[in-house]
Each structure stands twice: as structure tokens, then as C-alpha cells.
Amino acid sequence: MRVLVAMSGGVDSSVAAARMVDAGHDVVGVHLALSATPGTLRTGSRGCCSKEDAGDARRVADVLDIPFYVWDFADRFKEDVIDDFVASYERGETPNPCVRCNEKIKFSALAGRALALGFDALATGHYARLSDGRLRRAVDADKDQSYVLAVLTAQQLRHAVFPIGDTPKAQIRAEAAERGLAVADKPDSHDICFIPSGDTRAFLGARIGVRRGAVVDAGGTKLAEHEGVHGFTIGQRKGLGIAGPGPDGQPRYVTGIDAATGTVRVGGAEDLDVSRLTGERPVFTSGAAFGGPVECQVQVRAHGGLADAVASHDAGVLSVELRAPLRGVAAGQTMVIYRPDPEGDEVLASATISGAAGR
């Protein structure tokens, strides 16, 4: 099989490439250049493509004796990931850019080019498993990345390979060291790759500018003025611009964002509890949509826990009734539906959260 391996320059994709070589495949490595100014991207095995990362990937390819290329996807990345990220915050949402990158860049633009060039599959260093075309959680639950892959269609998954999903991260590092790969101890990066400072509010403010609005309590009383809804997310406690706790002495959190009026609503922790979710743009990873109701578990954050729920689908809307309330769920987040399975929880579907209500 002719396999293109996406090599970030980190330990995970490096071992993935090595395993593809060991399996006897015709392997080519590719590193994605995602910025016109590479120094602005964070480095690390979860980072995206600084000059240092490209050099690390090339050195691994040399050790493995495989062809290696750097492909420029900067324009596509800006349009489909960065611009989308900014626009989502302008709408008062909280997006996950890693989900978008997998959907639009790695497994659409990159995979599409790979297939056009005659490759049979795209391999990556994601922690996830595929069995009989079904996407499952990785063996290493702490590193599992099935959540950020749940936007992939059955067609995309048919050409995907995840060589390290059956191995714990510690073992991957040990294997890299045994193979003599210099990236064996390279640290992971857990922040947004195109915001190296980690200051999301400043990044958004520089692109959106000042759009003043009011911070109000549950009764609509104005408490403060802000410089844009893009500086807030549901569940946020710090940086609200208000003095002290609420009248009950308890902390106040962002409980609602109305981008149309520029209003940010705050309330108590209990006001963050939701028991019903709705999602747009559903994707069914096996290719078959379910109607409902389906007993399942739902995850609403990349590193969040699983919550028992019942899911149903009708007219392009994915609806979830939670068995117990979840706290601080924001529009724009991805919700992923899992079917519990002793062989590895199976991803059934995903959708972009458009509504959260009830307690």
C-alpha cells in the first residue's frame, strides 16, 4: 500500500511513520506549512509546523530513509481554520480549531491531494483506532483523540490509518528512543498552535477590534461594559470586568452571550447546568444515520468526560437528552456521541452545538 504520512515533527507522527515502514508499505512523509510566518506557530508534537518542527520531521524521515516533502497549505489553513475560528467567536461561540483542522485540512485538503497523487491512504499520529471502518477510542484514554476526529465521514475514514492508537503514549516515547529518533523526548503542546502567546482574547481583539457591549445580570441590570463578545465564553469566571461576587456572595460566571446585541449575561454556577443539547451539521462516522432514541454517551470538550445520554436525529438536527446535567456547555463546541463497547467506545456521530438548555 502506498501511504502518505503527515509528519508534524513530533514523537507521535514519527513513530506512526516508522510503523508504516515496518509494515512494508511504500511510505512518503509530508510536513504541512500552515503559516506564511512560521515563527508565529507554537512548536511541539501537538503544534503545527514551525521551522523547527519541519526540521525535526525531515531528520526523522532521513533516519527512516523515506522521501520527505513540505507542502504549503497556509492559505487554506487561514481560510478554513483561522478565519473560521475568528468568525465563530464573533458569533458568540466557542469553537475547537483542532476539529476544524482535521475536517478541512488534514483529511480533506491533504488527503484529497494524496489520493489524487495515487496514494492509497493517509496515516497520522492521532490517538484513535479504526476497526471495520468504525472509529473507536484509543487504548490510552488520557491521550485519546477520537473526539477531534469525529467530524470525519465514512469516506474519509476509509483512507485513514492511525498506527499508534493501540499503544499508550509512554510506550510510544520508549519506542521512539529505541529507534534512535531525536524527538523521543520532545514535549507535547496543548495550546492553539496559531496563538503561541496563549492569549486568545488578545489574538481575537487584534482581528475583530473593539465592539462595546454590556455585561448584565439575570434580570438585565447592567453591571459593566466590555469591548467585544469575542472576549468571553460560557462558564468564564475571570476577566468579566465586574466587582466581586453576586448578591448571594457566590462567584459569577458567563451564562449567556448574545452577539447580535453585544450582551454578555452572568449568573451563578447553577445557571450553567444544561440537560438538553441540539447540534447542527451532524456527521455519522459509520455512514449510516440513526433516528433514535439511542442510548449513548456524549462528550462536549476535547479533554472532557463522558455523560450518559439519549440521542436522536431528525431533519439534520442531532438532539441529546442528558441523564444528568452538564455544566458550562457553549454553542460552537463539538459534541460527540459514543456507543460504549468493551473493545473500545465507538464514535457514532458528531455535531456542532447550536443550543443548550434546561436543568
UniProtKB/Swiss-Prot annotation:
- Indicate where this protein resides in the cell: Cytoplasm
Q: Which residues are responsible for catalysis?
A: 101, 193
Q: What stretch or stretches form a coiled coil here?
A: none
Give positions of region: Interaction with tRNA: 143-145
Q: Where is this site: Interaction with tRNA?
A: 126, 333
EC number(s): the record gives: 2.8.1.13
Per its UniProt record, what InterPro entries does this chain match? MnmA-like (IPR004506), MnmA-like_C (IPR046885), MnmA-like_central (IPR046884), MnmA-like_central_sf (IPR023382), Rossmann-like_a/b/a_fold (IPR014729)
Gene3D superfamilies to which the protein is assigned, alphabetical: Adenine nucleotide alpha hydrolases-like domains, HUPs, Translation factors
Q: Which GO terms describe its biological process?
A: tRNA wobble position uridine thiolation
Query: Which cysteines bridge via disulfide bonds?
Result: 101-193
One matching Pfam family, short form?
tRNA_Me_trans_M
List the molecular function annotations (GO) for this entry: ATP binding; tRNA binding; tRNA-uridine 2-sulfurtransferase activity
Entry superkingdom = Bacteria
Protein name in the entry: tRNA-specific 2-thiouridylase MnmA
Protein's gene:
mnmA
